[in-house]
């Protein structure tokens, strides 16, 4: 299955249809009042798909989403109601809110709607049948009843004529709203379509040289990712906390009290062997910004491979020589996939290499390269320095993009209809 062979919203006729869209409105709410949205980015991201459905004559546009982790029970703290005023403001039109996401009353509201009426359903996760489980009073997982799950899925299916999935962030979860809506046409919205197109660009037909930049703390967390990428890439920059496991294991560099992944150290040799087999150039850091504690006000120092990091100090960023070699590798690449920052960028003294890597990535885009940032921390980096629109693609799904890059099939994508040949 190619990632680009799936039916998309532009392939289907929406005129006079009830268009059921799975969106990701899992927005952060102000902890004090629980109704103010602190970052509306996810709502803004869904607007092109919602507007397209309205502009193309949909009878009604029904939006379903989750918010937080209510664990299969109704909880006002996680209501989607606070989204309504923001959505009205952004769309410039009325939005009806339903107090549940399935059932006769919801069906009645949906079936009465016309003229592209937008309807937002209450949180899907108020029902244990959405995720397939709930938690009891002691916090233990309780599996949802199989028949109840089937009924819930039937209830969602009853609300639409066409299903659109625009929630890439949950595409790696086989939840009812992702895989259980049984309509003849199931298509991707613009957000999911863009994600699939860019990941196909990297994983299926990359322009070469193809570079992957991988950070993060543990080698063992990234092993599937590295394994899947090694046969595909031309170069690999290994940075962040996990680089110390490579340096100590392969070159016996003194790493002080830096992160060391015992389990990961056993596979480092295999990774390097596999890289050689596939002619992949592996770039590791050669110098470090060090600190006497994990804090922004730590006493800082500098160490090279030769000196090693002294006892009582840990590496929290890479140094200028490393950055130079990263920049050079980035500049000579045509496709760049970046997953994991080089340093603890949340703390100013250890953000320099991350910022420099981002600048090099932006420069690469300006020179015609494709740069894809794979969600999670690296997406936060792009947002922090206002570079989201200067990168070819910043993924909206941390876990989902990681699973794609590990070579796994995403249930929410697999469930979509194929384009007819």
Curated annotation (Swiss-Prot):
Kindly list the GO CC terms recorded for this protein.
cytosol; mitochondrion
Residues that bind ATP, according to the entry?
222, 241, 315, 346, 377-378
According to its UniProt record, the EC number is 2.7.2.3
MF term (GO), any = phosphoglycerate kinase activity
Q: Which Pfam families does the UniProt entry name for this protein?
A: PGK (PF00162)
This protein is called what? Phosphoglycerate kinase
Q: Which family does it belong to?
A: Belongs to the phosphoglycerate kinase family.
* Role: Catalyzes one of the two ATP producing reactions in the glycolytic pathway via the reversible conversion of 1,3-diphosphoglycerate to 3-phosphoglycerate. Both L- and D- forms of purine and pyrimidine nucleotides can be used as substrates, but the activity is much lower on pyrimidines. Negatively regulates the biosynthesis of acetyl-CoA from pyruvate in the mitochondrion.
Part of which pathway?
A: Carbohydrate degradation; glycolysis; pyruvate from D-glyceraldehyde 3-phosphate: step 2/5
- Superkingdom: Eukaryota
Check the record and name the CDD domains matching this protein: Phosphoglycerate_kinase
Query: So which cofactors does this thing need?
Result: Mg(2+)
Q: Which residues bind CDP?
A: 216, 221, 240, 340, 345
Record key words, sorted: ATP-binding, Cytoplasm, Glycolysis, Kinase, Magnesium, Metal-binding, Mitochondrion, Nucleotide-binding, Transferase
Question: For this UniProt entry, what is the primary localization, expressed as one broad class?
Answer: cytoplasm
Query: Which SUPFAM superfamilies has this protein been placed in?
Result: Phosphoglycerate kinase
Residue sites binding (2R)-3-phosphoglycerate per the record: 23-26, 41-42, 65-66, 68-69, 124-125, 172-173
Q: Subunit composition?
A: Monomer.
InterPro entries attached to this UniProt entry:
Phosphoglycerate_kinase, Phosphoglycerate_kinase_CS, Phosphoglycerate_kinase_N, Phosphoglycerate_kinase_sf
Q: Per UniProt, where does Mg(2+) bind?
A: 221, 377
Q: Name the reaction it catalyses.
A: (2R)-3-phosphoglycerate + ATP = (2R)-3-phospho-glyceroyl phosphate + ADP
Residues given in the record as AMP binding sites:
218, 222, 241, 315, 346
């Amino acid at each position: 299955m190619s990632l680009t062979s799936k039916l998309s919203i532009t392939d289907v006729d929406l005129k006079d249809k009830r268009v059921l869209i799975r969106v990701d409105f899992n927005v952060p709410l102000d902890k004090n009042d629980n109704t103010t949205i602190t970052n509306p980015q996810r709502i803004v991201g869904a607007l092109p798909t919602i507007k397209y459905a309205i502009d193309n004559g949909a009878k009604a546009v029904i939006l379903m989403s989750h918010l937080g982790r209510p664990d299969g029970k109704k909880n006002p703290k996680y209501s989607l109601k606070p989204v309504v005023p923001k959505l009205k403001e952004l769309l410039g039109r009325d939005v009806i809110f339903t107090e549940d996401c399935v059932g006769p009353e919801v069906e009645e509201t949906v079936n009465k709607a016309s003229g592209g009426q937008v309807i937002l359903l209450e949180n899907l996760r108020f029902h244990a049948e959405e995720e397939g489980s709930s938690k009891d009073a002691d916090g233990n997982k309780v599996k949802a009843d199989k028949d109840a799950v089937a009924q819930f899925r039937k209830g969602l299916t009853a609300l639409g004529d066409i299903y659109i999935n625009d929630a890439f962030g949950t595409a790696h979860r086989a939840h009812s709203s992702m895989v259980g809506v049984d309509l003849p046409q199931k298509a991707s919205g613009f957000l999911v379509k863009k994600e699939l197109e860019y990941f196909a660009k990297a994983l299926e037909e990359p322009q070469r040289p193809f570079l992957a930049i991988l950070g993060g703390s543990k080698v063992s967390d990234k092993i599937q990712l590295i394994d899947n990428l090694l046969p595909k890439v031309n170069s690999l920059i290994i940075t962040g906390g996990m680089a110390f496991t490579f340096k100590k294991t392969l070159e016996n560099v003194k790493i002080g009290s830096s992160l060391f992944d015992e389990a990961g150290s056993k596979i480092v040799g295999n990774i390097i062997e596999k890289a050689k087999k596939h002619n992949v150039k592996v770039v590791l850091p050669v110098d470090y910004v060090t600190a006497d504690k994990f804090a922004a006000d730590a006493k800082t120092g500098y160490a090279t491979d030769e000196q090693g990091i002294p006892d009582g100090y840990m590496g929290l960023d890479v140094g200028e020589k490393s950055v130079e070699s990263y920049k050079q590798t980035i500049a000579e690449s045509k496709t760049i996939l970046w997953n994991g920052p080089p340093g603890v960028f949340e703390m100013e003294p250890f953000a320099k290499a991350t910022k420099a890597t981002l600048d090099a990535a932006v420069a690469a885009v300006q020179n015609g390269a494709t740069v894809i940032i794979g969600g999670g921390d690296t997406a936060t980096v792009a947002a922090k320095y206002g570079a989201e629109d200067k990168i070819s693609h910043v993924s909206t799904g941390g876990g989902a993009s990681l699973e794609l890059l590990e070579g796994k099939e995403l249930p929410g994508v697999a469930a979509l209809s194929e384009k007819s040949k």
